[in-house]
């Protein structure tokens, strides 16, 4: 007989650990051991965290095979979404954030659950009414949610995280399913009321979009999973990928990471590979920086740190020169009816806000990516999002006992640490990673500053951003880097960041300054004002986390 239950969780969110183990029936009789059926595995040959791969290539997570876990997830989501659809819609109440529903799935089936060929398991759903609201806010209908996640087998992603998490993607590329640790799931539960308030005020965000939180109890273990938006569509060939924090301490990809098909590079790699940054038009740059500023304020209010900006780059010019083959192109089954795409699910939609887009940008032509250019003028599409907002909670807890030992100077580690992290993150993204393409000069400015050069120039008299007249007499703004003006200047130093103004020079609520604060030609790059503090901060982080 299956058992189903629901109710508010007790203080401390104990239901994350409670419940009948998967190998135990409702009567308390042991049904099997973890060595039976799909929970059996060979000796692991590779193990990262709870994730291991045996000699046959089978992936297991907490002694449950990946195939069994995928099947349990699909059975559980099918049941919970179906049962929720029978309940009338209503406003979200405070107690809805703490409700946990549980259903037991015996392998022989029951009057509530179908028979299956996996071992017995229990499936828990956290805050089902609240997450239903989140899905509706992003335009995800229940039938589309089920169709995306449960109509076809989930696809396991081989490039897992450093924490050993498992990642699955839905067959239509719409959703990502990620395994999370107990503390991360617990923290997400505590975040839900504030997350609800933030989404009501601003659904357009680069923060993760959570669509569901579940737990599979199998083989006596709790496997917690979260369903999120997919930042990186498989249908688009990615040429580079970066995980950026705005820090330089130990922020270089390892040799092992570099050997992967699509390595995830870090801050020092970016400064060496793309020292001039990525250039966006003025409106796009302003929208992106305002979105980052707003999202960082939300994270700061929750005292969240250690998050990253995940950025994948599709080079449109390279893609045109590459041969079309199965290794570089993924195809989505066009015979299937396309489900309703989630609102604000792409990088472009996340930053556009309610403002008019302007005549030069059309999202359908850019596959959801943000158009940009590098210093060579190559056309790029950027796919970005803020990640790892749950992992930081563990680090914050480790630091809580050390607050009194931290320096209270305004520029160094202090009790206002989340604000420091947010400010550094914004500065790095909007001054170093992303740059604004200069606007075409107006006729008045041309008259004042001359026909060919902008007003600001280096010691040699050469402008950083010259505007050369064309044959028709019109001026076209061009992106000219210091490497082009003075080839001897080495911009690839990984330990140097462009000069930025002190914190106090930026008024509260104003957008982060653009790249106009870069040093003029002929002047050596200066170390960021906070670089020494940054090094102390990162050393402190390393010592506290080990």
Curated annotation (Swiss-Prot):
It catalyses: a 1,2-diacyl-sn-glycero-3-phospho-(1D-myo-inositol 4-phosphate) + ATP = a 1,2-diacyl-sn-glycero-3-phospho-(1D-myo-inositol-4,5-bisphosphate) + ADP + H(+); 1-octadecanoyl-2-(5Z,8Z,11Z,14Z)-eicosatetraenoyl-sn-glycero-3-phospho-1D-myo-inositol 4-phosphate + ATP = 1-octadecanoyl-2-(5Z,8Z,11Z,14Z)-eicosatetraenoyl-sn-glycero-3-phospho-1D-myo-inositol 4,5-bisphosphate + ADP + H(+); 1,2-dihexadecanoyl-sn-glycero-3-phospho-(1D-myo-inositol-4-phosphate) + ATP = 1,2-dihexadecanoyl-sn-glycero-3-phospho-(1D-myo-inositol-4,5-bisphosphate) + ADP + H(+); 1-octadecanoyl-2-(9Z)-octadecenoyl-sn-glycero-3-phospho-1D-myo-inositol 4-phosphate + ATP = 1-octadecanoyl-2-(9Z)-octadecenoyl-sn-glycero-3-phospho-1D-myo-inositol 4,5-bisphosphate + ADP + H(+). GO terms for biological process: actin cytoskeleton organization; cell chemotaxis; fibroblast migration; focal adhesion assembly; phosphatidylinositol biosynthetic process; phosphatidylinositol metabolic process; phosphatidylinositol phosphate biosynthetic process; phospholipid biosynthetic process. The gene is Pip5k1a. There is a cross-link at residue 87 (Glycyl lysine isopeptide (Lys-Gly) (interchain with G-Cter in ubiquitin)). Residues 449-461 have a biased composition (Low complexity). This is Phosphatidylinositol 4-phosphate 5-kinase type-1 alpha. The keyword rRNA-binding does not apply. Residues 462-471 have a biased composition (Polar residues). The lineage of its organism: Eukaryota, Metazoa, Chordata, Craniata, Vertebrata. It is found in: Cell membrane; Cytoplasm; Nucleus; Nucleus speckle. One of its GO terms (cellular component) is lamellipodium. It comes from Rattus norvegicus.
């Amino acid at each position: 007989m299956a058992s189903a239950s629901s109710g508010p969780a007790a203080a401390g969110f104990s239901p994350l650990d409670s419940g009948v183990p998967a190998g135990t029936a409702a009567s308390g009789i042991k049904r099997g051991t973890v060595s039976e059926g799909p929970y059996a595995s060979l000796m692991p040959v590779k193990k990262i965290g709870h994730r291991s791969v045996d000699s046959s290539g089978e992936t297991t997570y907490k002694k449950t095979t990946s195939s069994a876990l995928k099947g349990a997830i699909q059975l559980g989501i099918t049941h919970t979404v179906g049962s929720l659809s029978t309940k009338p819609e209503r406003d979200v109440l405070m107690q809805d954030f703490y409700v946990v529903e549980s259903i037991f799935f015996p392998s022989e089936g029951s009057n509530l659950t179908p028979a299956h060929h996996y071992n017995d398991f229990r499936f828990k759903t956290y805050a089902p009414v609240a997450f239903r609201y989140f899905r509706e806010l992003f335009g995800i209908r229940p039938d589309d949610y089920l169709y995306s996640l449960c109509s076809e087998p989930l696809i396991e992603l081989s490039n897992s995280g450093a924490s050993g998490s498992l990642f699955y993607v839905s067959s239509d590329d719409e959703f990502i399913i990620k395994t999370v640790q107990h503390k991360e799931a617990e923290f997400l539960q505590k975040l839900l009321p504030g997350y609800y308030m933030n989404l009501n005020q601003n659904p357009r965000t680069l923060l993760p979009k959570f669509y569901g939180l579940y737990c599979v109890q199998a083989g006596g273990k709790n496997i917690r999973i979260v369903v999120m938006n997919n930042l990186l569509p498989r249908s688009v060939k990615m040429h580079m990928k970066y995980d950026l924090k705005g820090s330089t301490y130990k922020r270089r990809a390892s040799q092992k990471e570099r050997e992967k098909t699509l390595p995830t590079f870090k801050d020092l790699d970016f400064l060496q590979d793309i020292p001039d940054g990525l250039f966006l038009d003025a409106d796009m740059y302003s929208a992106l920086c305002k979105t980052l500023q707003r999202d960082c304020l939300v994270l700061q209010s929750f005292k969240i740190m250690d998050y990253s900006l995940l950025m994948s780059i599709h080079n449109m010019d390279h893609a045109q020169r590459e041969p079309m083959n199965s290794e570089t192109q993924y195809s989505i089954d066009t015979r299937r009816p396309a489900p309703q795409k989630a609102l604000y699910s792409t990088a472009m939609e996340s930053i556009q806000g309610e403002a008019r887009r302007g005549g030069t940008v059309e999202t359908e032509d850019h596959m959801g990516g943000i158009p940009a250019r590098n210093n060579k003028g190559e056309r790029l599409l950027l796919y970005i999002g803020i990640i790892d907002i749950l992992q930081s909670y563990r680090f914050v807890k480790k630091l809580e006992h050390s607050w009194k030992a931290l320096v209270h100077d305004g520029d160094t580690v202090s009790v206002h640490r989340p604000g420091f992290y947010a400010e550094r993150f914004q500065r790095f993204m909007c001054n170093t990673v992303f740059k604004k393409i200069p606007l075409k000069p107006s006729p008045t400015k041309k008259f004042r500053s001359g026909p060919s050069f902008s007003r600001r120039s280096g010691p040699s008299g050469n402008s950083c951003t010259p505007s050369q007249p064309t044959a028709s007499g019109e001026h076209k703004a061009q992106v000219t880097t210091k490497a082009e003006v003075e080839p001897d200047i080495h911009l690839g130093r990984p330990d140097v960041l462009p000069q930025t103004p002190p914190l106090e020079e930026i008024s509260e609520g104003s957008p982060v300054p653009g790249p106009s604060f870069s040093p003029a030609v002929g002047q050596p790059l200066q170390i960021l004002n906070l670089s020494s503090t940054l090094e102390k901060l990162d050393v402190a982080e390393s010592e506290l986390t080990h």
